[in-house]
Structure formats: C-alpha cells, structure tokens
C-alpha cells in the first residue's frame, strides 16, 4: 500500500481485492488509525482522515440530502463493494447509487479506497465496462491472495 501511495504518478484511489477474510478491512482500518494518529500530532496542514462507509449503506446515504456530503469526503472508503444491490428503486426511479458515487468521485478526482471480494471480471460484469475502465485510471489495485485468516470455513 505504501508503494501505491508514493508512486511518481499516483492514482487517486486504492482497491484492496481478494477472497473473504484475508485482511483487506484490517489494513484499511489500520491505515485509518494511522492517519488519525498523524493528524493528532499535527503532521498535516489540513485535518485529514478516512470515512469508511459500507457499500450496502450508500443508497440510503445518497438519498438523504444531509448526508449527500459523503460524496465530497476528501478520503472515502467503500467497504465490501459488490455486496450491495446494483440498482435500487426510489419512488419509481431506478438509481445506481454506488455507480453514481464512483462516477462523481472519478470526475472530481477524490481519493477513494475500496475493499471488495470481486475480481476484475466480476467488477466489469456487475458495474459495466465504463466503471471498469475508469477504475483502470483511478485505482491502484492491490490483490490479496492469502486464504482466510479466520480459520476453518464451513463446508456447505
């Protein structure tokens, strides 16, 4: 992750992707704690931090005018992207809250973290070629290839 943040031509986002339970969320939360610590020590000219939002909660946040500010958060993390419904109905209108949020953040070049269990093919299939193509420009992808750290999984 340090390499992704210090590239000569940095992208304005990081995607942590891989199977369940291999440390994506743990790394994101550790980075959030590090920024909070450094912020408290005065290492930044402006207050900075990461707001973490579960992908399933984005549709509710984007409908509420008071919480629409989530889209302008300087550093936003979308946790577990891919678990949410791609489209939602709002008074008869079909909305794509995560896609709309990602397109907005792409256009404004706002730093976005994403954790997901989806691979590149799954992202293209769920969100379409347009978002997948924008991710190529926007995100430094860090694959997590380890198996689950949570122990034995249930065989179902």
Question: What are these model-predicted stretches?
Answer:
Residues 13:
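Walker A (P-loop) ATP-phosphate-binding motif of ABC ATPase nucleotide-binding domains
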Residues 21-24:
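Conserved glycine(s) of the Walker
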Residues 27, 31:
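Hydrophobic positions on the alpha1 helix immediately C-terminal to the Walker A/P-loop
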Residues 33-36:
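Walker A/P-loop NTP-binding motif
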Residues 43-107:
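Conserved nucleotide-sensing/catalytic segment adjacent to the nucleotide-binding pocket
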């Amino acid at each position: 992750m340090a390499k992704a943040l210090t590239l000569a031509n940095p992208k304005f986002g990081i995607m942590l992707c891989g199977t369940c339970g291999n440390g994506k969320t743990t790394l994101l939360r550790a980075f959030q704690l590090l920024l909070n610590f450094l912020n408290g020590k005065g290492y930044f000219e402006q207050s900075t931090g990461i707001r973490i939002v579960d992908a399933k909660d984005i549709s509710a946040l984007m409908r509420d005018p008071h919480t629409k500010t989530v889209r302008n958060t300087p550093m936003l993390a979308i946790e577990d992207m891919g678990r949410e419904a791609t489209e939602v109905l709002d008074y008869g209108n079909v909305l794509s809250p995560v896609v709309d949020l990602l397109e907005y953040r792409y256009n404004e070049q706002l730093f976005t973290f994403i954790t997901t269990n989806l691979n590149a093919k799954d992202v293209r299939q769920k969100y379409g070629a347009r978002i997948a193509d924008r991710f190529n420009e926007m995100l430094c992808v860090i694959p997590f290839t380890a198996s689950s750290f949570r122990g034995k999984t249930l065989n179902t």
